[in-house]
């Protein structure tokens, strides 16, 4: 990239940065960002929510987390796909989870939490 980038002027660099910044998978549209105020998604990922009997996502889905062998790593998956699958688990439309684990977990998440988790895992 260096041979190509060395001839760019400051405006071209800014334009390229803006272009690539918009390509971030799962970015939140600023118009809808108010829907997510007060959601601590990192806490749900790392610690879960004891009050709702919600286990931490990272306990099973983090790379080398040591979760059940059938548990997929979510890092880098497309946000739209993750959101659709979490919604399907929550609504009982997807039922290939052993012992109903994901149906139970996803049913406890709000739609906004599902969206934020999908965005969070897609952006890693």
List the model feature ranges, each with a label.
Residues 1-8, 58, 62-91, 103, ...:
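Gly/Gly-Pro-rich "capping" loops immediately C-terminal to redox-active cysteine motifs
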Residues 6-28, 80, 105-124:
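C-terminal capping alpha-helices of c-type cytochrome domains
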Residues 10, 44-50, 54-58, 110-113:
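C-type cytochrome heme-c attachment and multiheme electron-transfer modules
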Residues 16, 20, 54-64, 117:
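The canonical Cys-X-X-Cys-His
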Residues 22-51, 72:
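Electrostatic cytochrome c docking/interface patches
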Residues 23-26, 47-48, 63, 92, ...:
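Generic structural signal for alpha-helix termini and adjacent loop/cap motifs
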Residues 27, 51, 67, 93-96:
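Alpha-solenoid repeat scaffolds
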